């Protein structure tokens, strides 16, 4: 296993409708005095010189947290698969860390563990928690872009199903692992 990890791009998905947040843009919702995106940014900024945020609104608010912003090719918030495709298209490195904007407890150890697993297996790596895949915590080789584009063209809209068309390494995490907490509803902001 290599000691040094290769350069990676970071893709933060912030392009959703925020339905469980009453339509509010989740990445910009305050938690502990800062927008959720600021918490994620603080962890990932030292890990990459290529930080991309997929957002479909509020670009001016996200700009300070990214090197580049991308939007979905289709209107009406088509889902995380569209955001991943858009992000992979502009990523500068061969490995891309994919994270949600509403996961402020993610840490460097988890990200580096996923990256190491992906590089060692020369394939995508995704968190598995309690037997379930968690595609919002993954590392993808940029070369999976055509597979995801083909899945999209065939009508697939599930990021997880599209990713599982290829070999994926699973990083097992406990069900109680707080690093995987998604703050995707108002009651979660009280945690």
UniProtKB/Swiss-Prot annotation:
Cellular localization per UniProt: Cytoplasm
Binding annotation for Mg(2+): 102
The protein's Enzyme Commission number: 2.7.7.77
Function per UniProt: Transfers a GMP moiety from GTP to Mo-molybdopterin (Mo-MPT) cofactor (Moco or molybdenum cofactor) to form Mo-molybdopterin guanine dinucleotide (Mo-MGD) cofactor.
CDD domains with a match to the protein in the record: MobA (cd02503)
Protein name (record): Molybdenum cofactor guanylyltransferase
Organism ancestry: Bacteria, Pseudomonadati, Pseudomonadota, Gammaproteobacteria, Pseudomonadales
Chief location: cytoplasm
Record-level Gene Ontology MF annotations: GTP binding; metal ion binding; molybdenum cofactor guanylyltransferase activity
Principal EC category: transferase
InterPro entries per the UniProt record, alphabetical: MobA-like_NTP_Trfase (IPR025877), Molybde_CF_guanTrfase (IPR013482), Nucleotide-diphossugar_trans (IPR029044)
Keyword tags: Cytoplasm, GTP-binding, Magnesium, Metal-binding, Molybdenum cofactor biosynthesis, Nucleotide-binding, Transferase
Domain of life: Bacteria
UniProt subunit comment: Monomer.
Binding locations of GTP: 13-15, 26, 72, 102
Family: Belongs to the MobA family.
Cofactor requirement: Mg(2+)
One annotated GO biological process: bis(molybdopterin guanine dinucleotide)molybdenum biosynthetic process
Reaction(s) catalysed (UniProt annotation): Mo-molybdopterin + GTP + H(+) = Mo-molybdopterin guanine dinucleotide + diphosphate
This protein's GO CC annotations: cytoplasm
Domain notes: The N-terminal domain determines nucleotide recognition and specific binding, while the C-terminal domain determines the specific binding to the target protein.
Cysteine disulfide links: none
Organism, scientific name: Pseudomonas putida (Arthrobacter siderocapsulatus)
Membrane as UniProt keyword: no
């Amino acid at each position: 296993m290599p000691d040094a990890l290769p350069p990676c791009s970071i893709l933060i998905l912030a392009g959703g409708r925020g339905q469980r947040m009453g339509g509010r843009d989740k990445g910009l919702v305050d938690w502990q005095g800062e927008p959720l995106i600021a918490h994620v940014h603080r962890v990932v900024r030292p890990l990459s010189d290529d930080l991309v945020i997929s957002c479909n609104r509020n670009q001016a608010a996200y700009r300070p947290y990214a090197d580049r912003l991308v939007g979905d090719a289709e209107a009406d918030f088509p889902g995380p698969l569209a955001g991943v495709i858009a992000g992979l298209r502009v990523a500068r490195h061969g490995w891309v860390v994919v994270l949600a904007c509403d996961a402020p407890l993610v840490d460097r150890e988890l990200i580096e563990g996923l990256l190491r697993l992906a590089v060692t297996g020369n394939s995508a790596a995704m968190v598995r928690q309690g037997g379930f895949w968690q595609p919002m915590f993954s590392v993808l080789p940029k070369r999976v872009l055509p597979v995801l584009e083909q899945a999209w063209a065939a009508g697939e809209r599930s990021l997880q199903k599209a990713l599982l068309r290829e070999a994926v390494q699973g990083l097992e995490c406990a069900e109680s692992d707080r690093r995987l907490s998604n703050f995707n509803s108002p009651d979660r902001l009280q945690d």
